Curated annotation (Swiss-Prot):
Family affiliation: Belongs to the lentiviruses Tat family.
Organism per entry: Human immunodeficiency virus type 1 group M subtype B (isolate SC) (HIV-1)
UniProt subcellular location: Host nucleus, Host nucleolus; Host cytoplasm; Secreted
Residues holding Zn(2+) 1: 22, 33-34, 37
Compositional bias (Basic and acidic residues): 1-12, 83-101
Residue numbers of Asymmetric dimethylarginine PTMs: 52-53
Entry protein name: Protein Tat
Ranges where the record places region Transactivation: 1-48
Amino acid sequence: MDPVDPRLEPWKHPGSQPKAACTSCYCKKCCFHCQVCFTTKGLGISYGRKKRRQRRRAPQDSQTHQVSLPKQPASQARGDPTGPKESKKKVERETETDPVD
């Protein structure tokens, strides 16, 4: 290894910076270009501020589209349509007629 001038900062040492500039390309070669490219492109880690995406506003005619949709029927109860009371009575009758012991 060549001797390095001790007065230079570590990030200014020869060979510490790649010869080509960083690009916005995400190909394999560019992802492994330097340590910064690897963390941002390869790993997807960025410590910068995240930009807020603005939500797309609905057009003014959106309420007319809501009216044209068919109404959904009321949700029906699942399971036994007779209800829980009758099913309990059936279980009680079965236990009375078929005693185990």
